[in-house]
């Protein structure tokens, strides 16, 4: 959600900022803007809509080597040019961009800013107006910045320009991701490393409640008490080509095709020198010492957690509960004596999951994060991390991170099973290799997927996904993919629940996508298909080879039944992709959605 960039050096700041914002588009946004320190003061450009629209209004003739930029995803105030960042104080001395949510902004307005006329509806404008108010009391800019931050409750990543000190950028972070990048005679600010790989791969990770004074030749980190902090930069393990589409029309299609390679990469990363699965002994011991596992996640990661529960309970014979993070915070269940928590998040920055992690850390419970970003907030604050090794995922709708989560969860379950002496009954690494082969086969059948999307989804207003056992969980993910990028009202249901209410929604021509990959429930789901067909539904049956029947729409290559979810989801991803194309939707950047949900 949202993105911040900043640059100070000798190059053209405008172009670097705009390119940086383009690299942050995947995070989701509805408006964008930049501010640069020009010869005659700070110049602000901002627009509602895409960055391409912002580019059109930026004056190429304005020379500037210092600036900040922002992509906004509306939380306070409607998407508009007025509410877009950067925001300025009344005198225009201070210009600010902000990610996060200031929870007490209305109270700050009443107590400190009663005489200020506000231009926007945002909580962000309170910060920049408060800065001006604090400086007016005689404080230095740095003192005023610290005072301002101490009065704010909530999350923030801030970039601030001072027209009277044009050779520096003030930065602050609390509960919202922010990095400072290090260059040769220049420095940068970014919400994540991808934004500034164009100029540097050296970054300093900021911690909560830290402020930074960024100059062309120096970076000074301090805490809110004014004490200086030393921290060395790290090298971003990314290449600029990792975040390019290459020959693909969309990132989503590229990332779907990358899934076989991701699975093979995961196998390699989690094997020991003998080719055996081997996880960190500390993780294994912590789980074995627990009496119940609690999986906490949101969205696609939650669906991965549901499948992960099946892996752990069937392989390792340990009880597992799966909870939506946003609900867990406010309705915590009765915990067992020795709980172990697993947090699943592609970005590692999901605010709802982090809120639960803070709670469980305070309670003294051990936690593991499964994430695609090892240096992320969840990774830092949990006791242990299992990386996904999926590479950057740019499309808002998750594909390769989801199957990577399933693969890592299966490996975790198998490792615990081995430690407990449970017999798995098959070679997991071998079977995952077969999964990768099956994925390649499926990714080569795009024409068939396109035809199914056109037949069932191109013009429909709604769609239902049904499945039994683990197929139900895969159906939930398929429904989410479809609604995310095609805007079709899609819902996933357990096949046996149809007759308890949902079947009332079936009309003539209603598309129903049924999954049949599990032998023990194959006849049950076939019966459910007959029920909806009798009410006029248009069924699309996706079955596993060996379980197929006459009339099935698509047959998946055979893999071990336990790992079927990794394969069954591929056609659902592709069908959703092509449905979105047929409906002329923005596949990579669907409306109202953000890749990294960093506010609760």
Swiss-Prot record:
It is found in: Cytoplasm. Catalyzes the first step in hexosamine metabolism, converting fructose-6P into glucosamine-6P using glutamine as a nitrogen source. Its main location: cytoplasm. The keyword Signal does not apply. Residues 283-422, 452-590 form the SIS domain. GO terms for cellular component: cytosol. It catalyses: D-fructose 6-phosphate + L-glutamine = D-glucosamine 6-phosphate + L-glutamate. The active site is at 2 (nucleophile), 595 (for fru-6p isomerization activity). It is an enzyme of class 2 (transferase). It comes from the Bacteria. InterPro entries: GATase_2_dom, GFAT, GFAT_N, GlmS/AgaS_SIS, GlmS/FrlB_SIS, Ntn_hydrolases_N, SIS_dom, SIS_dom_sf. Homodimer. Its EC number is 2.6.1.16. Keywords: Aminotransferase, Cytoplasm, Glutamine amidotransferase, Repeat, Transferase. GO terms for molecular function: carbohydrate derivative binding; glutamine-fructose-6-phosphate transaminase (isomerizing) activity. It holds the Pfam family GATase_6. Residues 2-217 form the Glutamine amidotransferase type-2 domain. This is Glutamine--fructose-6-phosphate aminotransferase [isomerizing]. One of its GO terms (biological process) is UDP-N-acetylglucosamine metabolic process. It comes from Bacillus anthracis.
């Amino acid at each position: 959600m949202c993105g911040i960039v900043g640059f100070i050096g000798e190059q053209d700041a405008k172009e670097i900022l705009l390119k940086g914002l383009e690299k942050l588009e995947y995070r989701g946004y509805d408006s964008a803007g930049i501010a640069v320190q020009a010869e005659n003061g700070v110049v602000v450009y901002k627009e509602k809509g895409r960055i391409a629209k912002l580019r059109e209004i930026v004056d190429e003739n304005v020379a500037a080597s210092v600036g900040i930029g922002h992509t906004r995803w509306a939380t306070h105030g409607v998407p508009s040019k007025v509410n877009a960042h950067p925001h300025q104080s009344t005198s225009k001395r201070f210009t600010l961009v902000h990610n996060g949510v200031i929870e007490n902004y209305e109270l700050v307005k009443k107590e400190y800013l009663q005489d200020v006329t506000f231009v926007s509806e945002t909580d962000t404008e309170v910060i920049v107006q408060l800065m001006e108010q604090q400086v007016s009391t005689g404080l230095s800019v740095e003192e005023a910045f610290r005072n301002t931050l101490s009065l704010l409750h909530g999350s923030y990543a801030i970039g601030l320009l001072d027209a009277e000190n044009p050779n520096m950028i003030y930065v602050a972070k609390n509960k919202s991701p922010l990095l400072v990048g290090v260059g040769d005679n220049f420095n940068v600010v970014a919400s994540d490393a991808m934004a500034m790989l164009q100029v540097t791969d050296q970054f300093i990770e900021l911690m909560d409640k830290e402020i930074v004074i960024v100059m062309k030749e120096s970076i000074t980190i301090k805490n809110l008490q004014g004490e200086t902090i030393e921290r060395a930069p790290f090298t971003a393990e990314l290449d600029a080509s990792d975040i390019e589409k290459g020959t693909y029309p969309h990132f989503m299609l590229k990332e779907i095709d990358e899934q076989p390679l991701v699975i093979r990469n995961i196998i390699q990363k989690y094997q020991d020198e003998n080719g055996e699965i081997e996880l960190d002994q500390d993780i294994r011991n912590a789980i074995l010492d627990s009496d119940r596992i609690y999986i906490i996640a949101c969205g696609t990661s939650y669906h991965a957690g549901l499948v992960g529960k099946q892996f752990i309970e069937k392989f390792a014979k340990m009880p597992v509960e799966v909870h939506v993070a946003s609900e867990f915070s406010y309705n915590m269940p009765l915990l067992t004596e020795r709980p172990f928590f697993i947090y699943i998040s592609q970005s590692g920055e999901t605010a709802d999951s982090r809120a639960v992690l803070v709670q469980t850390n305070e309670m003294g419970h051990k936690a593991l994060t499964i994430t695609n970003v090892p240096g992320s907030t969840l990774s830092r604050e949990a006791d242990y991390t299992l990386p996904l090794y999926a590479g950057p995922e740019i499309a808002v709708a998750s594909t390769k991170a989801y199957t990577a989560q399933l693969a890592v969860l299966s490996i975790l379950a198998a490792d615990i099973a081995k430690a407990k002496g449970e017999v798995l009954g098959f070679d997991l690494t071998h079977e995952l290799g077969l999964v990768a082969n099956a994925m390649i086969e499926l990714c080569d059948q795009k024409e068939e997927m396109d035809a199914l999307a056109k037949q069932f989804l191109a013009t429909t207003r709604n769609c239902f996904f049904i499945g039994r056992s683990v197929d139900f969980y895969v159906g939930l993910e398929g429904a989410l993919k479809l609604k995310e990028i095609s805007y079709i009202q899609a819902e996933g249901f357990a096949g046996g629940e149809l007759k308890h209410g949902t079947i009332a929604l079936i009309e003539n021509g209603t598309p129903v996508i049924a999954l049949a990959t599990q032998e023990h429930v194959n006849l049950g789901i076939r019966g459910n298909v007959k029920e909806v067909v009798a009410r006029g539904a248009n069924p699309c049956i996706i079955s596993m080879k060996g379980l197929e029947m006459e009339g099935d729409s698509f047959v998946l290559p055979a893999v071990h039944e336990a790992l079927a979810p990794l394969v069954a989801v591929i056609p659902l991803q592709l069908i959703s992709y092509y449905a979105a194309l047929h409906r002329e939707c923005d596949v990579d950047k669907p409306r109202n959605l953000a890749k990294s949900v960093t506010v609760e």
